[in-house]
Amino acid sequence: MAVEVVLGAVTCPSGQLVMMDGGYLEMWSGERVPDDEERPATDFAIVGPDAEAAADSFDRQTGTRLYDIPAHAVAEFTATFDEHCREHGHGASLRAFKQQVPHRERVRHAVAAREPGFIVMGVPVLPIEVPADRPLSVTAVPGEYGWQSMRIEFSDAPVADSWVFGELGVDHARFVFADADALSSWEHVRPLDGLADLILWGRDQEQVAAEFGAPPLGDTADVEYGWVDLPIMEAYQRGLAIETRRNEPGGPKFAFDFRPHSHHWQVMGLVRASEHEAGVIQVGGADIMMAMTSVGDGFFPVHLDVDVDGVPVALRIDIARED
């Protein structure tokens, strides 16, 4: 039997934990109304005597709220819902919110309504009520091809049963486990010190580094090239020039990364330096963890382990199941 590896611990002073793809935290609005001029959208509540039945059979999102419906599709979406209710005999309709619902408020609603999650522009978010008075240990079980599972422990009570809780969709190969209030202080892109790094790697990295005068970063065989601690606008302008070079037909093959000194940069530095690809930083008075999936992107089932009284003991994410 594989031995669990301790990845670290998170704290959750608000008592409400958020789990999602950590690479998408750039979209998190906290207590603010989501504001995306490029992708305007509307949020709806399903109302009426048959609201829950209509939500279940319509099956577009979990619960009786429908978030982030693109503005250009609102009329068609509403007509589709109305037709669905007529066909199924449901007494329900859509009521648009005056403005989009802040992501922090979506967490509050999901926890209070005992809904398993919600979406942020199509990205699954799983919130859950957890103990606020102690650190929550995060462990992982190793397997042949990566982690078999990860587990966030709420108590040391024996597990009597396990329920399907939801599913995490990941496009950036990383999970985040974070206090819902603390995420309102998260800076995903804005540099905290006004600086940024610009890193090059790949097949033709030496050629590109020579062209742009990028120094080596270290002295190992797999060394990368680039600049660290540049003023943000200088790093940005160099990045634009390098991107232009990369996009030239028949040009060199390489990759590069623009890394502003944000909270995301801080925690990913710890992740890259960690044997187990997990890191914890404090933001907004809480310890937040970023942990790589170990298997890249995908959809990962999440289970809720409970004790004999049905009280949650832990959340468990299935990662690389081995048959």
Describe the function of each predicted region.
Residues R272-E322:
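C-terminal structured interaction module
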